[in-house]
Each structure stands twice: as C-alpha cells, then as structure tokens.
Amino acid sequence: METQDSAYPWHDWNARITHECYEPNATARILDEKERILGIVNNYAAISFNFGATLLSWLAASAPETYQAILEADRLSVDRYSGHGCAIAQAYNHIILPLASDRDKRTQVRWGARDFELRFGRKPEGMWLPETAVDVDSLEALAEEGIAYTILEPHQAARWRELGEEEWQPANGHLDPTRPYLCRLPSGRGISIFFYDGPISRAVAFEQLLARGENLAHRLLGAFNDVREHTQLVNIATDGETYGHHHRFGEMALAYALQLIETTPGVRLTNYGQFLAQHPPAHEVEIVERTAWSCSHGVERWRSDCGCNTGAGQGWNQQWRTPLRDALDWLRDRACVIFEREGARVLRDPWAAREDFIDVILDRSSESVSRFLERHALAGAEVTTVLELLEMQRHALLMYTSCGWFFNDVSGIETVQILHYAGRVIQLAERVSHETLEPELLERLAPAYSNLPDRGTARRIYEREVIPARLDLARVAAHYAVLSLFESFDDMARVYCYEVTRRDFDVRRAGRARLAISSVEVRSLITHETAEFELAALHLGETELAGGVRRARGGADYDRVREELTRKMQPGGIPAVIRLLDAHFGETPLSVRSLFRDEQRRILHELIVATLEEAESTFRQLHERYDPLLRLHTRLGIPVPKVLQTAAEFDLNRQICRLLGHEPPPLMDLEAQLRQAGDEGVTLDESTTMAFGAAIERASERFRERPDDLDRLQSLETLVTIARDARLSLDLRRAQNRYYRMRAAVRPAIEASGNGEQWLSLFDSLGRKLTVAPAAAIPV
C-alpha cells in the first residue's frame, strides 16, 4: 500500500485507523476518577466482531501485535463462551453480494470462510454480509458453506411466525430483535438470523451514546423487557471504526460499559454462537430481498444515484455509479470468457481451481503453489499462465469492493483503488489472451463524471492515476536501478512482491557522480513471471539522474557496454557516459519517477536532509550568536524577529531529534536542549514530538527485554519524566501496555526477593508518570 496523504501523519488509512481503533480496542483502558489506568482489557474477547480478510492480511504484515491480539481474543472467547468464539467471518473482500454473479457470491463466501479457518484455527459459525446486503441466493451461499447464522437490520425482515404456526405476521421493521429466527431456503437448507437493535445501534453510531460508558450500559440494559417470557438477547451492530476512529475514546466507553454489564445481576455477556446453541430459533422469518443497512433504497447505493451519500457538496450527484458498475460488469464478463477459454488449456476445471485458489493467496510459498498445481493443472501447463489467469479472477473480485460506490465522488481514494484493481484485470487479461481490452473499458468509463471539474471523468482518472502506476517487470527493474544508487542490496533482494537476483554489479565514481551497472533477474512472487534485464544508472547529484533499463542481451554485448561505461567514468568523462547511456539504454530512461511512490518520497526526503545538513551549521551559528537576545525577548514578552525564531526552531528541533535517535538518549543533554527551547519560546514540531514518543517506546521495549536491568529502568523513567515536565502530548499506549503487563508478571518476584527496593521505587514512579493507578487501586 502506497502513501495516502489524506491519512497524514500516518502512512495510509489502514495505519491511521489501526492506531485510532483496531489497536486501542485490543488494549482498552478502564480509568478511575483521576483518569488513571485501572485496567487494560481486550474488547474483542467479550464481543462478537468481524474483520475482512484483506484487512487481516494487512494487519498480519504491518501491525502484528494487534493482529495477534485479535486472534488471541477469539481463543479466549472460545473458552469463555462454551466453545463458541467471538470472531465472525465475512464475505472475502466486502462486495455487495446481491449485485454479484452467482459464481462470485459463492467464491466470496468460500474464500471468506477459508481465510477465517486458516487464521482462527476453526470453522466460522457466523458470517457478516457486507453492508448487511442480502438476498435469498446470498443466504443459500452461506448455508452451502455451513454457516449457521448472520445478522441483519430489522427492516430487512418481511414477515415472521412461530415455528409450527400457519399465519405469518408482517414485520414492518418492528419484529422482536431479542431472539434468533430461522430462515428456510428454497434448497431445503436453513440459516439462523439475528436482527440487531436498530435504535440503539444508531444512537451508538450517530447520537454520542459513546460519550460515557455508563450511558451505553444503561441504554443496553434498558432494552430488556419484563413482559417477554423468553430469554432475551440484546444485541447491536455498528461499524467497528465507531469505537475510536469515528468517536475518540469510544473503545474506553465500550470497555467500561461491558464491565458494568458483567456486574449487573441477572444479566450476562454472550456471543451469537453461544446464544444460538443454548436458545435455538422458535420462530421463522422471511427477508426483504436486495436490502442493506446503509441504503434506504435497497442496494441502489452501489449502482445508481439513489440519493444516499456521506454528505455531498451542494449540487453534487452520484450519477457516476451506474456507468462505473456497467463498465466493471463488462470487464468481469470479458475476463470470465477469457478465463474459461484460456483456463481450459491449462486447468482441469478452471472454476474449481478458482474456488481453491484462496489456499495460494494465503500461502504463496513454492510448496503451496506446487500442491495447488498438482490438484488442478493439466500436465505441461505453464505455471505463470495458470497464476496469471487466477490472479486476473482475484482482481476481478477485488474491483467490486463496496466502498468504491459508497462515497460521494468517483475521484475518491476508494473508487480510484477499485480502478487500480480493474487496471490489473486488464493487464493480466491482455497478457494471457493477446486481446486489446483497455480502449473499450476507457470508453465505458467516460460517462462517469466527477463532481469536481478538474478531475474529469472515471476515464480521465484511470488514465492519470492507474496507467502510470501500472507495474511490470521492467518497471521493477527500473526501480531497482535507481534505488541501487542510494542504498546497498544483497545479491537477492525483495522489492514488494518481486524478487530481484543480481548476476553482476559494478559501481564507479567520478567526483560527485556515481554510476551503477548491473545485470539482474526479476521474478514476480505472485505470478512467477521472470525476465532478465541490464541496468545502468548515473547519479549526478541531488535529483539529476541518467541511464536506463533494457532486456538482457548478455554475453559479449553486455561486457562491451560495461567496459565502455567504466572506462569513460572519470573526471571530465561524464558527457561521454551520458551519450553512451542514451545510445544503449535510451528506450527506458531513468528518473526519480522510476521509483515507486514511497521510495520517491524517501529518497527526496534523504536528499532534502542532506541539503539541510549543509545549511545546519549556518542556522546554528545564527542561533548561538543571538541566543541571549532570543532569551531576553522571550522573558520580556516581546515578539522575536522571524528570522531568529526560524533559526532557533530549526536548530533546536534538529538537535533534539538527533539526541532522541541515540540508544539510549543522552538524558542530561536532552534536558538541557528542552530547557533552552522553553527559555527561547521554541515549540517542538510534530516530527520531534513523534521522535520523543518513539524513543520512549524503544526504551520501554529495552526494559521489557531486560526487566532486572536497573539502568534501563532508570533511563525509561527519566525519559518519561522529561517528557511530562516538558508538557509534551505523547501517545504512551504501548509503553503503558508493557508496564501494565510487567507489573503483573515481574513486580511480584522482585518484591518477594527482598532486595529490590530501588527497583520497586523506580518502577512505581514510572507507573505514576505513565498514569497507571497503583496496584492496590486495581480491582482483583
């Protein structure tokens, strides 16, 4: 995932929402009246929850502690709730199932169930329907896969009756949501449906019910009705992001509410699986087909300008939804024709292979691919062709991810992302079939107009953002060539989902100029496509680059070109080197744009840092010379001249960041710099504050690794003290988590030893400064 600027200061929206929601719910705080941490709990272990498969894949790679906490919560809930885990599966990549083809419905359900099983170590009992979008065929797909239940909104019930009775009762959106219902299906199968409490769910999402945990608890408890004679289940359903992302500290309100409910006589927490096992349906229901919880017009939000949006600008419309879906439907159908035709040449049963391809998606190892090919490939089938066909189908599913239609404009990042998926379908379909499909897709995207005139149409967005970002092996080789000028690689390097093997490498310098010449093999870890390239890249300083990439010619030709370049690479020979590069590598010229987006930013940042380092001494001299004048201005409350203020801010922030980068930081020097910043009225910028938080996190991890090391404890305690004294607003969540766990696991042994008085004093002081309540204050 590349940088998403709108998620700043985080790298992307997954990272931001993980920080604001997914991670906090795994370590939710319960506070006392002094806002000290009384307890840290994993909300996921108490409530039913679901994560999409693609999000879990990202969490496993990018936020492993949070990912493991989610898996552990399900394991704990299996013990807590009589063998029924809290985790619920989801249709694979959150497509609107009623708008999908029958085949895609079943693949989405099967892939979602299989992904769940491999992650959580058990088969799913329940499955969340994306946006609760439902029709009978979707329920059939769930039942075929052995799913026992799903959850819907009350208005999605058409009518209900008690089992064994003849007469149906119209639901009208008001059926009893405190019991499960059986939905009989045309196949003879059945599936249980829970209907969540709509008013309370809406109050949580939109009416500030999460402002206080006791308010949420009282509202939930108030939903029980003594008139009902059956065992009642009060259940609500909301977007998970509600708890922390949409409503800050919502995870704390939830944690406190759960604690209050657990201590209420006559009431206990449960999950859907346990409740269903203990209280099977005594009533049946029929659904209103093609409905969803987030559209009052059925499922039109994902294919037409129905009026549902997220607060569009005045005069905006969503007429772009229809041509977008029509274009993708056309592409899906063309991809299916190609898949069946070309797949029949390499696969025993192409569609059966697609159903099982989830095993390869979850495990890309050579062994996994070999097992898959043994089951499905015809003798002599070309591996890359097989994988490209199946990847084409995977992206044809991904391009229907529901958020692509949910929001206000076709230019939003969610819609642009599904266009990227469509672009990958085009790339793979054209490669395996040798047909030309992209011009037709562009024509079909042209009627999808953005509400922002400068963004044009979906066609223009595709041309501007999808086509230039398209990857192939040559683009990876170009990226590698440029990056090799700035950093060192081993002979085998991983570049995202590609593997680059270096056959030959030579670097020459002439003054500031640097020339890298290489012969490499690039291999896709996804499709196993492989090609060899020859690279030559010349860095002339700052962002000036020359060179290029060409398909390998090998042998004497490569040796001759390398010899010519290295011979000319000397002072005064740079113009000749550039002419040689143009002559031999001019077809694919290199520039900073050859880098993938994240590396573009990183390299440019490094170049800027290098430039700033040259200017740093000038700023420091200016700052040091006028330091007494700055202090006097600050003491007298007189505004500091802009040039001096800028010099002071630049110099002090740079020095503090540099000190924080040491392991461990030199604490006396750090205190002195912070005092100087205070005396001169200098505010620490965001990067310095984040560096301070990162230093505390690293110090807490060093202490966790060696809890008996008094120096490490002292360093951490002092660092936190310095931050508090400087009144820095820091995120100390991870340091608090480690402290909380260590107090239970380490402190008792130190105390029992009888010779840890200094350690205990420092440790307890650290707890106070991390705002953790004393051990005696924490309820057992």
Report residues per predicted region.
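Extended alpha-helical scaffold segments
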Residues: 622, 626-780
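Leucine-rich, hydrophobic repeat-scaffold detector
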Residues: 492, 509-512
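Active-site and substrate-binding clefts of carbohydrate-active enzymes
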Residues: 1-32, 53-54, 168-486, 511-526, ...
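Charge-dense, extended regions
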Residues: 531-533
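Catalytic alpha-helical scaffold of carbohydrate-active enzymes acting on polysaccharides/glycoconjugates
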Residues: 15-18, 22-125, 133-202, 210, ...
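Positions that flank functional sites
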Residues: 132, 157, 277, 415, ...
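Short linear interaction motifs
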Residues: 27-32, 378-390, 498-504, 653-659, ...
